[in-house]
Amino acid sequence: METIGRNDACWCGSGKKYKKCHCHFDEKLKELQQEGHIIPSHDMIKTPEQIEKIKESGKINIAVLDYVAEHIKAGVTTQQIDDWVYEQTTSRGAIPAPLNYEGFPKSVCTSVNDQVCHGIPSEDVVLQEGDIINVDVSTIYHGYFSDSSRMFCIGEVSEEKKKLVDVTKECVEIGLENVKPWALLGDMGHAVHMHAVENGYTVVKEIGGHGVGLQFHEDPYVSYVSEPGTGMVMAPGMMFTIEPMVNMGTDEFYVDKVDEWQIYTEDGKPSAQWEVQVLVTEDGYELIAY
C-alpha cells in the first residue's frame, strides 16, 4: 500500500486531505493485513463519482431485464431475446457489453435448461413450455459497466426445476446477507455454497463472481465454493457480482467444442443462476443491478 502524507491529497481523487478522507480506511486495511488477511488494492475501491456513474449503467441494465421479463414466453426464440436486449440497450444510449467481447457474437447470454452459462442466442432455440432460462444482461454506459441476470420459468415447469430456480435465488439472497464491510468473501461464498448443498445441489467451482464497474471483469474473483475464514476482505467501495451457478446434478461441465463459449452440465441435468451487482457500503451493501 502506497505511503501518503496525512496532509497530502487523498489517493481517491476526492480533493480532500488524506487525513480527512481515506486515512482511517487504510489504517483499518493495514491492521487486517497484519492479521493475515488478503486486502483489496486501491484500484478495487470505487470513488463516489464512479459509483454514481456505474449506478446509471445499472439502471439501464435493470430496465432491459424488466423488458425481457414482460415479453418472454413459450414460442419466443433466444435470438428474439437478443434483439430485444440490443434494441432496449442502444435506445437508451448504451452498449451491450457482451457483443464482440473476446469474440462473443451476441448482445446477451441466454442459457436454457442444462446450459450453465454463456448460451449463444439463436433462431433455432425456441423456448418451450417447461423450460428454464437464464438471461444475462451486461451494459456499458458512458464507459461504465453493469451486469446482472435473472431466471425465467417458461409456462408450467416441473416442481424439480422450480425448486432449483427458487433455491438458487435464495443462495444469492444469503450472499447479500453476508456482504458486510470488513467481512471476508470466503465466508460469504461458503454461506452460499452451504445453502445449495443443504438442498441437494452442487455449485460450479471453476466459474464465480467478479469485480465490475470500470471494466466488464475486474478483480476480485469471487468463489462460491469457498472455505470460511478465507478470501479477500470486503471493504466499502468494492463492487462485485454474486452469481452462483447451481446444478441439479453434478458440478462437472463441458464447453461446446464448436463455438468454445457455451457451457453445459456434464450429466445433462438443469442448472440455474441469478446474478446481482453489489456495492459494499459502510453499513452493508447496495444493489447496483439485479
Where are these regions (language model features)?
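Conserved N-terminal segment of EGF-like repeats
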Residues: 1
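Active-site neighborhoods and metal-handling regions in enzymes and metal-associated proteins
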Residues: 5-8, 14-290
